[in-house]
């Protein structure tokens, strides 16, 4: 029990990133009275899939990239995991930490005519610190991170109690895509957490943590990790659901906000005044910084590894932090808007990979099943990404909108992926023992 709870809280802390706190309030603000169904969709991809990803990694003893290389193709592994580390690194996740900490912690205290200059100055300091600590690893960063996660959780608990005791306002009717498709909209909103990608990148930590507790037998490691994941599911589900309720009660009084950072900051001010905003700013700022340091270091380490050392760690780190600085200054709302099409196109590939790897024994690990299912997923997920970017292919878009179920809600890949897997399984049944080269 002790090992299960310890690892469960560790898994929770991995995914309990300050940057992800902005999404449930924004989703619920727009979903209004439909927010419960939207939250279920969000939890499916924001919590369920990452924890399935962890289980998939535990199942193969941490050797997940080797499984992908063997089942699909070496180049597929190189390209997809290269994109994964870019997404959770300098493309989106790292600049988002700088943008979120500015939006929540600094913007509320700046005069309007100094907003742009303030953002440039703050993010410069933020990413200089990111580079310095990532280039010079220190236990101080780990210690600060371990302290701040419980402090942030405690602050949010106080905020949640206040919200449930005396909500800011009434819940309004849904708007935009949440009127007709709250679950599907919440499902794709969950992509923005990028926690499935993070799970596949750092999932080996869960195995290491269990082994460090003295559990060495593979079956016992597997059981402990699954139980720990259930602990993390309960904690994360409670936090995200409470954040969603907070967001749903805000627009009737505070109006509609452009992003979740504004909602959190405004709600904190309503309940606790400037003192509350200062506390939240401090906690979020340092929590985002520790996340930025860890993820930037992981990105640089991965690309140094796959390049066989031809790309130096510090050069990669410098490039990542400079790019993150530029991207963060686009602003949080714009950064999220740009990331959506990329994630809508990329996420389905990893969803299919994780589900197939969990069901691997059912079709004897057939490479054909993997290749057909992913091969059918890829073109349709790209089409979904183009639609999310409002750049649909003429003719093709209209055809898919008419004849492909779920395409209108950016889930057009789902049935083709299932069809590819079924065809692969049936082919194997008719050709026992066949494996493609």
State each model region's role.
Residues 2-11, 36, 74-87, 120-125, ...:
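Select transmembrane alpha-helical segments in multipass membrane proteins
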Residues 27, 99-118, 211-212, 292-319:
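Helix-loop-helix connectors at the membrane interface of multi-pass transporters/channels
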Residues 59-67, 126-148, 212-215, 325-338, ...:
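Membrane-water interface regions at transmembrane-helix termini and the short interhelical loops
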Residues 90, 94, 153-178, 196-197, ...:
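Hydrophobic alpha-helical segments and their helix-loop junctions in multi-pass secondary transporters
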Residues 133-163, 339-351, 370-380:
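Membrane-interface loop-to-helix entry segments
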Residues 166, 366-437:
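A generic transmembrane alpha-helix motif of multi-pass inner-membrane proteins
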């Amino acid at each position: 029990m002790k090992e299960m709870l310890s690892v469960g809280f560790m898994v929770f802390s991995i995914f309990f990133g300050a940057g992800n706190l902005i999404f449930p309030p924004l989703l619920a603000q727009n979903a209004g009275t439909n927010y419960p169904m939207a939250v279920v969709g969000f939890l499916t991809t924001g919590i369920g899939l990452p924890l399935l990803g962890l289980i998939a990694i535990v199942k193969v003893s941490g050797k997940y990239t080797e499984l992908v290389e063997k089942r699909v193709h070496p180049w597929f592994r190189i390209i997809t995991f290269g994109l994964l580390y870019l997404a959770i690194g300098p493309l989106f996740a790292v600049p988002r930490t700088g943008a979120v900490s500015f939006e929540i912690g600094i913007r509320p205290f700046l005069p309007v005519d100094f907003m742009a200059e303030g953002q440039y100055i703050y993010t410069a300091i933020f990413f200089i610190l990111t580079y310095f600590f990532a280039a010079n690893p220190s236990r101080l960063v780990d210690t600060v991170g371990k302290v701040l996660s419980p402090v942030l959780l405690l602050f949010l608990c106080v905020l949640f109690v206040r919200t449930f005791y005396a909500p800011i306002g009434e819940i309004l009717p849904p708007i935009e895509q949440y009127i007709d498709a709250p679950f599907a909209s919440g499902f794709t909103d969950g992509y923005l957490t990028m926690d499935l990608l993070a799970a596949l990148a750092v999932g080996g930590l869960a195995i290491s943590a269990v082994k460090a507790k003295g559990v060495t037998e593979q079956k016992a490691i597997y059981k402990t990790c699954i139980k720990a994941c259930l602990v993390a599911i309960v904690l994360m589900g409670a936090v995200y659901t409470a954040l969603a309720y907070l967001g749903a009660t805000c627009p009737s009084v505070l109006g509609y906000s452009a992003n979740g950072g504004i909602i959190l900051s405004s709600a904190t001010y309503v309940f606790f005044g400037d003192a509350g905003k200062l506390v939240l700013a401090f906690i979020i700022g340092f929590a985002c910084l520790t996340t930025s340091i860890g993820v930037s270091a992981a990105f640089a380490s991965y690309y140094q590894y796959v390049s066989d050392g031809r790309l130096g760690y510090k050069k990669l780190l410098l490039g990542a932090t400079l790019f993150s600085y530029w991207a963060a200054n686009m602003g949080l709302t714009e950064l999220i808007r740009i990331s959506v099409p990329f994630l809508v196109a990329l996420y389905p590939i990893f969803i299919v990979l994780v589900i197939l790897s969990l069901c691997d024994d059912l079709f004897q690990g057939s490479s054909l099943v993997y290749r057909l299912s992913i091969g059918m997923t890829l073109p349709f997920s790209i089409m979904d990404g183009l639609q999310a970017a409002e750049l649909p292919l003429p003719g093709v878009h209209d055809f898919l909108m008419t004849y492909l179920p779920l395409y209108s809600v950016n889930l057009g890949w789902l049935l083709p992926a299932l069809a590819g897997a079924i065809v692969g399984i049936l082919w194997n049944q008719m050709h026992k023992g066949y494996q493609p080269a």
